[in-house]
């Protein structure tokens, strides 16, 4: 009876559609894969910590076997291998060429650091008068020395000769001058040479030694080594000379001292300025011209203070005025007196005539109203 009822229900078309729709909309369940490791399981809402694996302890036999295998691999790798492709060889060559180029800058920096360190050692040895250390640092590398620069300078432009002269080390000064240390025109940042530094420190004999070092006397070996040269004429000394060191000789320097002394004109430039120091370092004397023989302009170049807003060439050029004034000089900001224009003068004259006419009329009316 139940089976026949079910057959009648399924025979209805609408009920058959509902049954098929219900079967299609039934949700599909997700099948979860159980955890294979017990450490991944969650218990009581918390994940269980993983068990750390104990690292194997390397005993002596294992270490010996490892090194023997490593040596065997090195010996086997020394066997000739097959030729690499051309592309791989080009890549390796390009990589090797690029690496030294990238390492060029640090090498240059290291070279500069070594040069500065060598200069500091030479200056210290000259100041202490250590001739043994000076010979070791200044002798060429072919002779077993370090090959240092005898005219090396520090940040304050001090040379080894300046340090030795300032410290009064006569033996070191004589050795440096004998090796050809330069001092003519070589000044520090304050414009002082080695002779002046020795005089300031109270060593006049060292200063005299420095000034007389470039005389015309020569040692016998230098006389035999010198070759005859053509005679030349010196305009400063007014005589002919054949010595190549004539311009640094005592006679030439004395003839230069007979020149007209520089004038004491104020330049308006402090002696501590970098430009003044550069001129002194180049051999310039204060007050003399800027030419090689002390000729040329000695005063500042006249300039013009442009105080208006007119274009260039609008009016006649004003008189040049030197702008190198001293401190707190009121002439630097003083201007010319204002000159009124013609239109301004005519307006003032008209107002004056009108005021005069009103005064005459006022006096006339006052006179006519008087009773005698």
UniProtKB/Swiss-Prot annotation:
Record keywords, A-Z: ANK repeat, Isopeptide bond, Repeat, Ubl conjugation
Repeat as UniProt keyword: yes
GO molecular function: nucleic acid binding
Keyword 4Fe-4S attached: no
InterPro entries per UniProt: Ankyrin_rpt (IPR002110), Ankyrin_rpt-contain_sf (IPR036770), G_patch_dom (IPR000467), GPANK1 (IPR039146)
Placement of covalent cross-link Glycyl lysine isopeptide (Lys-Gly) (interchain with G-Cter in SUMO2): 306
PROSITE patterns xrefs: ANK_REP_REGION (PS50297), G_PATCH (PS50174)
Segments forming domain G-patch: 271-317
ANK repeat feature ranges: 124-155, 156-186
Extent of Polar residues compositional bias: 220-233
Pfam families linked to this entry: Ank_2, G-patch
Ranges where the record places region Disordered: 74-110, 211-233, 251-271, 330-357
Residue ranges with Basic and acidic residues bias: 330-340, 348-357
Protein name as catalogued: G patch domain and ankyrin repeat-containing protein 1
Species assigned in the record: Mus musculus
């Amino acid at each position: 009876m139940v089976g026949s009822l079910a057959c009648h229900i399924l025979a209805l078309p609408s009920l058959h559609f509902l049954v098929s729709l219900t079967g299609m909309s039934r949700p599909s369940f997700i099948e979860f894969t159980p955890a294979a490791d017990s450490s991944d399981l969650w218990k009581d809402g918390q994940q269980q910590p993983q068990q750390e694996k104990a690292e194997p302890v390397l005993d002596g036999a294992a270490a010996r076997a490892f090194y023997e295998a490593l040596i065997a691999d090195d010996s086997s790798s020394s066997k000739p291998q097959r030729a690499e492709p051309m592309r791989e060889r080009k890549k390796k060559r390009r990589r090797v060429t690029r690496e030294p180029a990238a390492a060029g800058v640090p090498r240059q920096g290291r070279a500069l650091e070594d040069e500065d360190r060598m200069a500091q050692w030479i200056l210290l040895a000259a100041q202490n008068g250590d001739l043994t250390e000076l010979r070791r640092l200044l002798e060429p590398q072919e002779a077993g020395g370090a090959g240092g620069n005898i005219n090396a300078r520090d940040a304050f432009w001090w040379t080894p000769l300046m340090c030795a002269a300032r410290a009064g080390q006569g033996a070191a000064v004589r050795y440096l001058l004998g090796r050809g240390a330069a001092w003519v025109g070589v000044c520090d940042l304050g414009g002082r040479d080695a002779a002046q530094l020795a005089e300031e420190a109270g060593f006049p004999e060292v200063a005299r030694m420095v000034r007389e070092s470039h005389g015309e006397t020569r040692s016998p070996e230098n006389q035999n080594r010198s070759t005859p040269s053509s005679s030349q004429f010196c305009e400063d000394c007014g005589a002919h000379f054949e010595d190549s060191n004539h311009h640094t000789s005592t006679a030439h320097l004395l003839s230069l001292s007979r020149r007209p002394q520089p004038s004491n004109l104020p330049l308006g430039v402090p002696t501590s300025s970098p430009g003044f120091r550069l001129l002194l370092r180049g051999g310039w004397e204060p007050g003399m011209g800027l030419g090689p023989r002390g000729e040329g302009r000695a005063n500042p170049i006249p300039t013009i203070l442009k105080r208006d807003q007119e274009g260039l060439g609008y009016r006649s050029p004003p008189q040049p005025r030197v702008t190198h004034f001293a401190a707190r000089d009121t002439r630097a900001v003083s201007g010319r007196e204002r000159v009124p224009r013609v239109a301004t003068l005519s307006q003032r004259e008209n107002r004056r005539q009108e005021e005069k006419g009103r005064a005459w009329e006022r006096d006339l009316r006052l006179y006519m109203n008087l009773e005698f």
